[in-house]
From Swiss-Prot:
Family of the protein in this entry: Belongs to the frog skin active peptide (FSAP) family. Cruzioseptin subfamily.
Keyword terms of this UniProt record: Amidation, Amphibian defense peptide, Antimicrobial, Cleavage on pair of basic residues, Secreted
Residue ranges the record assigns to the propeptide: 27-28
Superkingdom of the organism of origin: Eukaryota
Any GO BP annotation: defense response
Function comment: Has antimicrobial activity.
CC terms in the record's Gene Ontology section: extracellular region
Name of this chain's protein: Cruzioseptin-4
Length: 28
């Protein structure tokens, strides 16, 4: 199950990066 949690963390970080990118694109 630890591997599963690692996947969740990885996906979460990726999602955060995408959201931040979209927000930055929207502001400019």
């Amino acid at each position: 199950k630890r591997g599963f949690l690692d996947v969740i963390k990885h996906v979460g970080k990726a999602a955060l990066s995408v959201v931040s990118h979209l927000i930055n694109e929207g502001e400019h």
